[in-house]
Regions:
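Polar/acidic, low-complexity leader/linker segments enriched in S/T/G and N/D
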Residues: 1-52, 157-169, 178
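Residue microenvironments linked to proteolytic maturation
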Residues: 8-18, 73-167
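Pocket-edge structural micro-motifs
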Residues: 22-23, 61-63, 86, 140
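Conserved short "hinge" loops at termini or chain/domain junctions
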Residues: 25, 59, 63, 77-79
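Short, charged/polar surface micro-motifs in flexible loops or helix N-caps
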Residues: 26-29, 64-67, 90-93, 117
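Short conserved beta-strand and strand-loop elements enriched in small hydrophobics
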Residues: 54-63, 109
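Catalytic zinc-binding patch centered on the HExxH motif and its immediate surroundings
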Residues: 70
Length: 179
């Protein structure tokens, strides 16, 4: 009898320095947690934390804060999960991380968080209702299967300008000379 291991491989196209990924899927039960009945994150569990911290959330490798590679530039809290976009600056570690992303070494994401409010689901699983997001990590083995790198691309002009607020009306008419 032979055992076969089938791996799902994905092709992540590298076109820039922004990593986009589903940091945590909603309503997916993980059993790679201390609770024997599992744990799942409810929709918008991180909404308050994201509102407070915004782009001051960092991306590191394997939850090692000494290997921080990127900073959040945008969040999308959709029905499937919390999607984050992180910008990698130039640097030896960041450049190597981009190469490793292209080679499939970092296919998944994981969140470090502190639960603020939890409840129990009908199946006994811990349901995280509200949590404080500490950081996000690129990992090889996620706690939640749906937490995955979705793309690596160039920053969109709108995502770079989102945090600046509305554009002010400025009169660019030349001023008359008085001398």
């Amino acid at each position: 009898m032979s055992d076969h291991l089938f791996l799902d491989t994905r092709d992540v196209t590298i076109t820039g320095r922004n990593v986009i990924g589903r940091c945590v899927p909603y309503n997916e039960t993980s059993y790679l947690v201390p609770s024997p009945k599992g744990e799942r994150i409810r929709r918008q569990a991180f909404a308050e934390s994201i509102a407070q911290r915004g782009t001051n959330v960092f991306l590191n490798l394997e939850h090692d804060e000494t290997r921080t590679v990127a900073k959040a530039v945008r969040w999308d809290d959709d029905d499937d999960g919390l999607v984050g976009e992180f910008h990698l600056r130039s640097g030896e570690l960041q450049d190597r991380t981009l190469e490793e992303l292209a080679d499939g070494w970092w296919p998944y994401m994981s969140v470090a968080f502190r639960p603020l409010r939890e409840t129990r689901g009908g199946d006994g699983a811990v349901e995280v209702v509200t949590a404080k997001l500490a950081h996000v990590a690129l990992v090889k083995c996620p706690a939640y299967d749906g937490a995955e790198v979705l793309a690596v691309r160039n920053a969109s002009p709108t995502s770079l300008l989102e945090g600046l607020g509305p554009r002010p009306d400025i009169d660019l008419t030349p001023l008359p000379r008085f001398w």
